[in-house]
Amino acid sequence: MAARGRFPERVVYIWGESGAGKTHLLKAFAELCAARGAAYGTAAEYEPQARRPILVLDDIEGLAEEGQADLFNAFNDHAFTFLLVAATSAPRDVPLRRDLATRLATGLTYRLHALTDAEKGAALAAHARVRGFGLNDDVASYLLTHARRDMGSLIAALDALDRYSLETGRIVTVPLLKAALDESRA
């Protein structure tokens, strides 16, 4: 869809709890569509009258009143060909002007759920493989119980573990992970 520049809907609204991956998806989409004028931004960074053919707005519930009015007018003026937004609540519950919330609800709406521990473990193992090392279940389980649990923090911890493993010349094990976490907290 994005690679061809054709969108079946004018609006896609993604919502879910913090850490579910909304920002990751929006940034990846904006990067994929950058040649067509897309750029990632948060609602706090939204500049009224700054028109782009593809708008990608994160944390839409933080859009100021002036931005809400401008985005509503952009809808009516067909000032963009595609709008991708993310929020922590569904369109009917988002704290925005009712007319804007109604417009946002006219397209596709997807709810993202946070990954389960098993899915996080699988994602960490896949990330480790890409980085060139294996991650056994014991290491993944320890990481899930002793580090911040959002995927961004877990990936950062895994990357730090990889660097620590290379610096010390040791393979990735639970004792190495403990040492790496202790060092990062010191």
What residue ranges belong to the model's regions?
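Post-Walker A helix-loop "phosphate-sensing" segment adjacent to the P-loop in P-loop NTPases
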Residues: 31-42, 51-52
